[in-house]
């Protein structure tokens, strides 16, 4: 079999690995690159129509965000994921498509005034819906056959609702080799989700390393800290505005807010209102509430058995329309506002910041990672003014963080996961980590007796009975340009064109033996298209 590392190698986003084994060609994840780009992802080396199926570890866009593009360019196979992941992808991929369409529309409005060529969205809502129709839901712990000689099992890894490690048994000839893809390994003792499950055996392991260089430290008292922030803000007559990731973090905050209200930890403010002002967060919350209780941890299941909704909070109000959102800030009653995006780069949260940042009685509470260059990072680093909707806003609100909240295991958690194998795997491939972090974690694994390496994007390895052999090292050269719009987007769009060309060749081959009249018409259409673009 052959393994090609296409994305999230020596960087964190854009996860994608291609396997060619037992006569099949398939992907583990197909994610979108986000934030700062260090090493450019490799384009698919084959046409999307030549991919037989995809396995998805979890619903985050950096693991799934290019699936609509894959469908647009001719992929028609099945996409296997756990049932909660299928549900979450149904809303997250559509939301991603809306963002792509909105950004293209905005650029075209500006471009028309400058006489620029129209910009096409990376993909559309129709592409997202086409991808969603290809999903097949799979239960945890159920071993399934994907093709002759290929079996898989999804194991709960505690990172996000539906997240999984994937066990693969691949039989070629008389030899069966077991691969394990860790997915994103969850943190221990987090609300709602189970702790990561451990796997007993593997020949080769592909594991993430996001926090492979650090220790989270003791778990903070989230409920106590949050209650203190609410108390002092409400006593001042202000709002607590929480920029929050729509899927996962918003539901954790609802869990904590329910506990605060049940225990009466905020005094003198009665049943203070809590607003969810994010359509995506609202849909995600519904999915959490409708999910099989077996997906949750023991404490959450115990609440459900008592008839208690773990994320159902008295005083919770759902903001659906834009008018609903605007009305929130006309009411001066102290309140909690949960809104996306979590890094304040887009979405309704920016309107709430405009209305609350300048008020010294209010608090802006960050509960997740803030990437360099984002508005959220600017605020926590002490900016005195920021610009929102073209208007300078003075930062007079209290800015604070609820630290220690992470959906990723730290170094010790990663070691605990990999050391659970009863015998050491023949090799551990370290992926999904920043450049230096991957190198540090490879050294850590080596010190613990593992054979480990950190491949680069484009690396190829052959795995057989004799072991694993590196066929190609991949690209070690860092990108000159860091983020988003330039080299990476251009390469992605050009790859769409290449894929379209490969698809055209397949269509030509399928028409062999057709009526001469039809073939002549087809040839004329192709030549006319070539004449238009051969410039």
What are these regions (language model features)?
Residues 52, 203, 335, 362, ...:
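Conserved acidic residues
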Residues 100-105, 292-305, 387, 469-495:
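A polyampholytic, Gly/Pro-enriched intrinsically disordered region
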Residues 150-154, 287-295, 415, 465-475:
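Short, surface-exposed amphipathic charged segments that create phosphate/polyanion-binding patches used
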Residues 229-374, 386-387, 422, 437-439, ...:
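Hard-cation-handling environments
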Residues 387-418:
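Generic long, charged, amphipathic alpha-helical segments
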Residues 458-521:
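Charged, amphipathic alpha-helical linkers/stalks
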